[in-house]
């Protein structure tokens, strides 16, 4: 590291192996984002979206799934949600909107359920029963009913996953103890009155099903993506596709030979998709804890890092990991949450970098896993469930506020953090005389005047907190807060002097503000001395 003022590496993703002196990097509630041609830097830290409450109605029960249907009353798509044992439908959403409730109850379990629709019925698989409701029924006529499923080999079918492809619904069989590697398919365009998974005319009803061809793995996940069915077990996956007879009831699907691998999933709820990408937390006879991305018919690509896999291995509940994917401003994100460990890690397809997201309990001051679950795009909003009282919220770039994990209210500032890479110079002693943050300043929103009629500019005074480590991140020294500019103060500089010394120098910046801002880099003035 030469002397004088220089730009040093700072922006990046999370990568923190056990040996901290190698790298202690963490990026929390920031997204490393590529810039355009001739920009001042190639990569910046952009803010993750804020959160706001989209509907004040409270279910009082945990959400088990959300789904944006293909149609509804008057041909308009709707939002559906399963909360506890009840199913609700929103034809619009807003502050004081109350959803319509289906008659009947989902009587099995309290965990996640799987939802799909075929344009006629909404289908819900809860691990025991397949439930359906008419998509187009009026609010007062919404009624749940159970589908009579045929037995397979003399035992009842217990579906935990449902998907839709080629005008058919497809389900697995998660009957405990059976461990069956079969999936059943329905008739074409089944309604609440006609939906069937049995061969027409058979008595007793004989199931329409296929057995997995590549492995005897029980089927734990089914993903319909780009006209293909991805069938995933604990130690393998394979791909099926609609065949020449997909418009008849005889033999609608073909196994895609060669599109298989001995990589399955150790966490069925981690399976997620976006565009042509399918993700999951992988498991096989050879090992566990790697995250894979599969695109089309290609072989799966490991996208997790060694540091992340070590972190996953430390979890005692990795099999309960939850995954979902969503797109935002040119990014495609795969989010993987380990609730018991208070951890959410996010892979960005555009940069191939990982970052972290967290939500804070402002009563205890503890940061935990990111709250959002079950994201859907509906009503022109990116909706999700993530409150403690069952309210629907949305992700938005209009605010930097986030949901308080203690109260469920979206009224707290986002807590953002970046721990940069280790700065070192062949083990020489490095003394940092001055440190400046290259960041967006002066964009603090205007506040309401403290005195009515007062026209004096009034805005909050946002601050950045600096911590430094001279030993690679093992011990830290807190330095004072610095302002990064009231509203309109675009020339504000954010810098510290006499920041300390070390042979492995690490910088950590923290922010707790309720508006979005961007960080571009770090400049330091440093001196070197001999070993």
Regions found by a protein language model. Name each.
Residues 1-99, 104-120, 262-277, 283-531:
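Beta-sheet repeat architectures centered on beta-propellers
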Residues 6, 42-44, 121, 134, ...:
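Acidic/proline-rich low-complexity IDRs
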Residues 128, 174-175, 350:
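Anionic group-transfer/hydrolysis microenvironments
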Residues 45-47, 81, 89, 132, ...:
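Generic detector of low-complexity/intrinsically disordered segments
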Residues 52-66, 96-110, 141-321:
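Beta-propeller and closely related beta-pinwheel folds
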């Amino acid at each position: 590291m030469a002397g004088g003022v220089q730009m040093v590496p700072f922006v990046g993703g999370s990568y923190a192996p056990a040996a901290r002196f190698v790298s202690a990097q963490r990026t929390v509630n920031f997204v490393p984002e590529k810039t355009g041609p001739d920009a001042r830097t190639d990569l910046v830290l952009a803010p993750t979206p804020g959160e706001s409450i989209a509907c004040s109605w409270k279910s009082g029960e945990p959400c088990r799934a959300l789904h944006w249907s293909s149609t509804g009353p008057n041909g308009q798509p709707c939002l559906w949600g399963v909360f506890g044992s009840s199913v609700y439908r929103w034809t619009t959403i807003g502050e004081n909107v109350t959803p319509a409730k289906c008659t009947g109850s989902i009587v099995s379990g309290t965990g996640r359920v799987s939802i799909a629709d075929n344009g006629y019925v909404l289908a819900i698989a809860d691990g025991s029963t397949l439930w359906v409701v008419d998509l187009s029924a009026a609010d007062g006529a919404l009624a749940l009913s159970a589908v009579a499923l045929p037995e397979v080999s003399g035992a009842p079918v217990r579906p935990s996953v449902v998907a839709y492809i080629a005008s058919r619904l497809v389900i697995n069989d998660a009957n405990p103890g059976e461990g069956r590697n079969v999936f059943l398919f329905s008739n074409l365009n089944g309604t609440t009155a006609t939906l069937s998974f049995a061969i027409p005319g058979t008595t007793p009803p004989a199931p329409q099903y296929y057995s997995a061809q590549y492995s005897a793995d029980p089927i734990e996940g089914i993903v319909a993506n780009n006209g293909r069915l991805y069938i995933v077990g604990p130690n393998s996956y394979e791909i099926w596709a609609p065949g020449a007879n997909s418009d008849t009831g005889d033999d609608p699907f073909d196994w895609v030979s060669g599109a298989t691998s001995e990589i399955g999933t150790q966490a069925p709820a981690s399976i997620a998709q976006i565009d042509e990408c399918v993700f999951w937390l992988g498991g096989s006879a050879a090992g566990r804890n790697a995250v894979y991305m599969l695109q089309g018919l290609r072989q799966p690509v490991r996208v997790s890092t060694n540091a992340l896999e070590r972190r996953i291995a430390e979890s005692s509940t990795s099999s309960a990991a939850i995954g979902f994917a969503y797109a935002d401003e040119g990014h495609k994100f795969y989010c993987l949450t380990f609730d018991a460990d208070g951890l959410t890690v996010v892979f960005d397809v555009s940069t191939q970098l990982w970052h972290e997201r967290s939500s804070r309990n402002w009563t205890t001051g503890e940061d935990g896993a990111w709250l959002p679950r079950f994201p859907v795009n509906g009503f022109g909003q990116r909706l999700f469930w993530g409150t403690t009282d069952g309210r629907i919220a949305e992700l938005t770039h209009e605010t930097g506020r986030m949901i308080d994990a203690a109260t469920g209210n979206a009224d707290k500032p986002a807590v953002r953090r970046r721990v940069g890479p280790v700065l070192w110079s062949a083990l020489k002693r490095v003394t940092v005389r001055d440190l400046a943050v290259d960041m967006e300043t002066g964009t603090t929103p205007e506040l309401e005047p403290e005195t009515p009629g007062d026209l004096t500019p009034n805005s909050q005074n946002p601050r950045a907190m600096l911590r430094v480590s001279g030993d690679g991140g093992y011990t830290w020294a807190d330095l004072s807060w610095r302002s990064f500019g009231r509203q309109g103060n675009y020339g504000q500089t954010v810098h510290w002097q006499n920041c300390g010394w070390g042979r492995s120098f690490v910088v950590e910046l923290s922010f707790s503000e309720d508006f979005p801002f961007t960080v571009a880099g770090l400049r330091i003035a440093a001196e070197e001395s001999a070993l």
